[in-house]
Amino acid sequence: MGKGRIFQAAKVYQRASEAAATNIVSGLPPRNPPLWLKAIESIPPAEINTRPYPIQHSPPNPRARKPRNLFRPTKIVYPEDELRRDFYRDHPWELARPRMIIELDGKDARFLDWSKGLRQRGIPLSGESVVQRQLWLMENQGMTKQEAYDKARHEFYKLRQLEQMERRIAVEEARMVGGYFGKDLLTVGMELENKTYESWKKWATTEIARQESARASMYTNVVDNSALEESEEDELLAQN
């Protein structure tokens, strides 16, 4: 037995049937098929040790003269991948929003109905809602990719505006009854940035002063030997 997997295990029945139906010596009656041939016909061998041809997710290339990577699994591509890539390319800041990816039993998608819009029970609004809504519009209402994207995107913008208005009104109502809110994340980030800038400015001023003093001391330490060289030349001329 050769190394690796057995490639011909799935063709045992076909080969045995062909061998039984073929006469090696002409003139003799056909050979009796083996007893196990009927059993293997009804119960084929398992393909645990075989290497089946993987499912192709893309049409074959007619220009290819010789098939390559015949037994290599192809890339798994879903229709949502391209829609998701387009949305987050146009809305990169949506990736900065916190996401909740915890599910109860992994089958939460059964309770979602994208025909009713982007708001779904138990799922916060996110870019994935736009992707699933766009896919539903393309498959069920016959819209093109761009038409479904525009419709889902406008619905998403309206819901985001409503969320911002609700949040702003809630803050105003809380302040009306004496609520106090600390610094938001933007203010804290600006303060940290200003603090870092002032620290860098102080260091840069000190560093510039140090470099200027080093440059000035470099010129003051240079000894002028031109007068000494001229006197030596005069002595040599006098001796000659």
From Swiss-Prot:
InterPro entries: Ribosomal_mS23_fun. One of its GO terms (cellular component) is mitochondrial small ribosomal subunit. The keyword S-adenosyl-L-methionine does not apply. One of its GO terms (molecular function) is structural constituent of ribosome. It comes from the Eukaryota. Keywords: Mitochondrion, Ribonucleoprotein, Ribosomal protein. It is found in: Mitochondrion. Its main location: mitochondrion. The keyword Mitochondrion applies. Belongs to the mitochondrion-specific ribosomal protein mS23 family. Component of the mitochondrial ribosome (mitoribosome), a dedicated translation machinery responsible for the synthesis of mitochondrial genome-encoded proteins, including at least some of the essential transmembrane subunits of the mitochondrial respiratory chain. The mitoribosomes are attached to the mitochondrial inner membrane and translation products are cotranslationally integrated into the membrane. Component of the mitochondrial small ribosomal subunit (mt-SSU). Mature N.crassa 74S mitochondrial ribosomes consist of a small (37S) and a large (54S) subunit. The 37S small subunit contains a 16S ribosomal RNA (16S mt-rRNA) and 32 different proteins. The 54S large subunit contains a 23S rRNA (23S mt-rRNA) and 42 different proteins. PANTHER family: 37S RIBOSOMAL PROTEIN S25, MITOCHONDRIAL, SMALL RIBOSOMAL SUBUNIT PROTEIN MS23. This is Small ribosomal subunit protein mS23. It comes from Neurospora crassa (strain ATCC 24698 / 74-OR23-1A / CBS 708.71 / DSM 1257 / FGSC 987). The gene is rsm25.
